[in-house]
Amino acid sequence: MAKTNISPGMQQYLDIKKDYPDAFLLFRMGDFYELFYEDAVKAAQLLEIGLTSRNKNAENPIPMAGVPHHSAQQYIDVLIELGYKVAVAEQMEDPKQAVGVVKREVVQVITPGTVVDSAKPDSANNFLVAVDFDGCRYGLAYMDVSTGEFCVTDLADFTSVRSEIQNLKAKEVLLGFDLSEEEQTILVKQMNLLLSYEETVYEDKSLIDGQLTTVELTAAGKLLQYVHKTQMRELSHLQALVHYEIKDYLQMSYATKSSLDLVENARTNKKHGSLYWLLDETKTAMGMRLLRSWIDRPLVSKEAILERQEIIQVFLNAFIERTDLSNSLKGVYDIERLSSRVSFGKANPKDLLQLGHTLAQVPYIKAILESFNSPCVDKLVNDIDSLPELEYLIRTAIDTDAPATISEGSIIRTGFDERLDHYRKVMREGTGWIADIEAKERQASGINNLKIDYNKKDGYYFHVTTSNLSLVPEHFFRKATLKNSERYGTAELAKIEGQMLEAREESSSLEYDIFMCIRAQVETYINRLQKLAKTLATVDVLQSLAVVAETNHYIRPQFNDNHMITIQEGRHAVVEKVMGVQEYIPNSISFDQQTSIQLITGPNMSGKSTYMRQLALTVIMAQMGSFVAADHVDLPLFDAIFTRIGAADDLISGQSTFMVEMMEANQAIKRASDNSLILFDELGRGTATYDGMALAQAIIEYIHDRVGAKTIFATHYHELTDLSTKLTSLVNVHVATLEKDGDVTFLHKIAEGPADKSYGIHVAKIAGLPKSLLKRADEVLIRLETQSRSTEIISVPSKVEPSSAAREGQLSLFPDEDKSQEIIHTLEAIDVMNMTPLQAMTTLYELKKLL
């Protein structure tokens, strides 16, 4: 970049830019934000705007691109969405009054994790995450700058850190330590995160209170430092730090939440078709965010769950009051984000009107809640602060037709300020005064076409044509001479003009000052507004769950301490909603105290995965306090859910289906307790048949003997059904089918015992494969099944080697040890999956000769 012969203005740009090398610098110049050098070239491509140059005739013209200041936000949004940072440099003085170069300073750095304003507002949270590491444990803090939410926890390993970042759907992660190359690859390439770095811990500890570990303190402190450094102002809306423990909620990895379609449908990445979509009858943006949080973090405290259930039950029992409550909540705006705009000094008159309208609704909401006459609802009533004095201030101060900007005037109501009312009267009546003067002078002078005009240069003046110059009165004084006319003024006109101009200027300045004063007063209420926002959000979510429960005929689940699962006629709530109640086939699920594992067999498309997901969603809904889709439900409280459902390869990281399966299985067996729920669908299918079967059996035995978690294990390995004879806590179930005249009907009902067939060829028929191909598959299947019936299955001990006495009493399949070894080696070398039937028969013949 050539920097010779740089103008003072460009030198100012370069001086500012060197402090923000990792950000696009928007440099305010008049009505535009300009970008220069590499920023201009890159922004022109990304934003699809014109690229020009400064000093075009110079030897080294400077690349330049710009966007209008009034539409800059939409361009900033694009850059942020692409993962970049933007530094905004404003003019800090009036260019007309500046001596030399206009003073400019960066007033804000906008990053993917610190977005407050957006041309496309979204009700979802936007979390900035900070992670620190002390060599043993990780501290993780997160904040939504747009709402003020601020939380911290500590985690044992990087896998947990990754999962929590994914759960928060963060776009930017702030690091206080050096990552390994593998960890950096995971965060940047796999998770598409912007990584930022901060070494300084924020000194003001007013927001950080409570018993925290050192690594939690440093993570939270560095997060605060980064936010203050980028926002460059005191942020009064930031809430006191909340410490949380992962174990205080039902633990689920991001992969588990994705496979269960909790907040978005995994196939479409849209809200539709998710549990969030099903349960969302909220009326406010705050309620939507809280509902998502409840789905993300179901409770493990029975007392807290029952408290939510009780309020939902009260709402269910009072249809009219609940309907009134829902309608009143429709008038509630996003208090959290309005408060943050006040804190950032960005709240406009429309924002305050929305806040005032919300506060006007609060007394009605409070009265409706009181009408339920319920002690559990009264707790919510007691938490509602109506802030009547703030509502009165906004109602009496801000005009209901006020514009969205603070520079256009017409913001403050008439009657709020006497001086402003006087100035407005002068401006309003001044026009009449001028008309009176015009009529009076026209009559006195005899100039019939005499009129008063106005322009910025001459102000108000009498317009006199050349033919009437002889009639001009003596008290007129000349202001300007034109070709065919002259302009005159009078002392009286000048006096009125002075009063009107003063009123216009003073009115605009005074109205701005009054608005700023009102906004400052609103800021003093932010803490109370945030508490009100939390309560209204809770009310909104609870009424939403009541509406959903009534609409879909859900029931109130019960909880037990005896480790039993009883679900009568349960339904997969989301599938039922999509299909319709009439088409959905319910299933009961039962685990007694002695049963820990259900081994489920049956064909694809028959409903095994839906059955497993049904149980998971029922548990999640129950533990978030919701009613559930069933005729009767009695559950233990689970501490975690582990799943492997679905076969999506991790293509970005190069991990195959089988590797992902094994990693998720490892997480489950290492982290699960006897209070956990494990759901494995076709584990082991990603490798060779016997490898997969062996691993599946070993995992089942490990869960049975060492973990004790309630487990549903779906499999195509029918040989595994024999495990029920030696694993006392395992039972076989299968998906029922109906065969008639060669056709197979999947009943989507779970029945006791193992499945007798896989019906894979029937599934292929449904998929539309050619008839000749299906006929050939039937022929091959019959031959393979005939061979299979002539083959003995050898049971392998699962725990420890048998004693020598046991070995002595055990009959040997191959009396001759040498022949045994030869046969074993021959068997190990066989590639069963690639053998023709003829080759299989020949091999079998050769093996028989060795006996």
Curated annotation (Swiss-Prot):
* UniProt source species: Streptococcus pyogenes serotype M18 (strain MGAS8232)
Per the record, the domain of life is Bacteria
Per UniProt, ATP binds at: G602, P603, N604, M605, S606, G607, K608, S609
| SUPFAM superfamilies in alphabetical order | DNA repair protein MutS, domain I, DNA repair protein MutS, domain II, DNA repair protein MutS, domain III, P-loop containing nucleoside triphosphate hydrolases
Task: Mention any one GO cellular component term assigned to this protein in its UniProt record.
Answer: cytosol
Protein name in UniProt = DNA mismatch repair protein MutS
A Pfam family that the UniProt record links to this protein: MutS_III
PROSITE patterns associated with the record: DNA_MISMATCH_REPAIR_2
Its biological purpose is as follows: This protein is involved in the repair of mismatches in DNA. It is possible that it carries out the mismatch recognition step. This protein has a weak ATPase activity.
What processes in GO biological process is this protein linked to? mismatch repair
Q: What molecular function terms (GO) are annotated for this protein?
A: ATP binding; ATP-dependent DNA damage sensor activity; damaged DNA binding; mismatched DNA binding
